[in-house]
Amino acid sequence: MKGFYMYYLGIILASVIGYFLGSISWSIIIVKKVGNIDIRTVGSGNPGATNTVRTLGKKWGLVVAFLDALKVVFTAIVAILLSMIPNDLFSQTSYFIPCIFALIGHCYPIYYKFKGGKAVSCFLGLLFVVNVLYLIIFLIIWFISVAISRKVSVASMFSALIILLIMWIPYLSGVSYFIWEWNGLEKFRVAWKNYILFSLLNSFHYWFSNTWASGILEGNIIILIGGLILAWRHSQNIKRIKNKTEPDTFPKKVKPVR
């Protein structure tokens, strides 16, 4: 039995904790607390940051987005703490894999009958954990896309698609060629020694003098899974976009006729 769990107990524990953290719906909690409204009964009915904007305004929508992203980051911190336990069962605890379970918990929360958000804010948290540079690129593309389309759904899906394409460029991870090995410690070592910390949290493996760190391939697979979940959660939006019935999240202000 120990052979099965060898090296992976930390991943399993962090993933379970991540799912329960991800299942906390900040939009439901905050909208109920601030406006005494069940967010699932107003607007799009989706318990997420965008519907919070529609219900309470941009300020509270930003708060919800930040807290939802933080669920993924906290999950990574749990994994980091577990990896520091001086035991083989925790020595290869991935900081990436548990984070996808936080995203799944956000979309399918056990506390709310498995009906949750659309993964965008948690996807931002996932990008921060895997590669900060991906997060910066996503946000730049997102803001430009929102300004053009006025639709958060379009901006989110388009930005995620761009990340899924460019993440295969090795230089964006601070290395000169793609790392196919599951253990990325040796290949990342030079980049981290030179303080090229695009993969900021992953570098904690190095600073803790560990013998293992997640490779680029693992991070990309996790981002790919997160991107596919994001697209799946936007399936109804995609249908409305095709039918040209998707409403603007931020409608253009019409100047009054004088």
Curated annotation (Swiss-Prot):
A GO-annotated cellular component: plasma membrane
Assembly description: Probably interacts with PlsX.
Designated name of the protein: Glycerol-3-phosphate acyltransferase
Species per Swiss-Prot/TrEMBL record: Mycoplasma mycoides subsp. mycoides SC (strain CCUG 32753 / NCTC 10114 / PG1)
Reaction(s) the record says it catalyses: an acyl phosphate + sn-glycerol 3-phosphate = a 1-acyl-sn-glycero-3-phosphate + phosphate
Subcellular location: Cell membrane
PANTHER family associated with the record: GLYCEROL-3-PHOSPHATE ACYLTRANSFERASE-RELATED, INNER MEMBRANE PROTEIN YGIH
Spans traversing the lipid bilayer: 11-31, 62-82, 94-114, 124-144, 160-180, 212-232
GO biological process, one term: phospholipid biosynthetic process
